[in-house]
A protein has these predicted regions:
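Active-site-flanking beta-strand signature of metal-NTP-handling nucleotidyl enzymes
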Residues: 2-8
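Long, low-complexity, Ser/Thr/Gly/Pro-rich intrinsically disordered segments that act as flexible linkers
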Residues: 92-97
Length: 97
């Protein structure tokens, strides 16, 4: 199993907006093990989307189909201005032992 963290460092005042958008997206994706988290300690204005997959291959397959359903496409429209809401981002992939 792997756990993936997609991390966004948001501009001040935007973390809750970004988290809300991702939460709405997480509610419509077929994968049900998606968590949207905001910082309580550490770097400020951080939003982390955490998800788990059986393998790296399963993650790659999931990325291929992301945003394909009509419901996802509708929610993804709200992301069109997201690039203006964050400063940087990164992805971390962890193997669970």
């Amino acid at each position: 199993m792997i756990i993936v963290h997609d991390i966004f460092i948001c501009k001040p005042g935007n973390a809750s907006k970004v988290a809300k958008m991702f939460k709405e997206w997480a509610d419509v994706v077929p994968q049900k093990n998606v968590y949207v988290m905001t910082d309580m300690t550490g770097q400020f204005h951080r939003v982390v989307i955490a998800s788990s997959f059986e393998s790296l291959t399963a993650y790659e397959e999931g990325m291929k189909t992301m945003g394909q359903s009509e419901e996802e496409k509708k929610v993804m429209e709200k992301f069109k201005d997201m690039n203006e809401m964050y400063l940087s981002g990164s992805r971390e992939i962890f193997k669970v032992w």
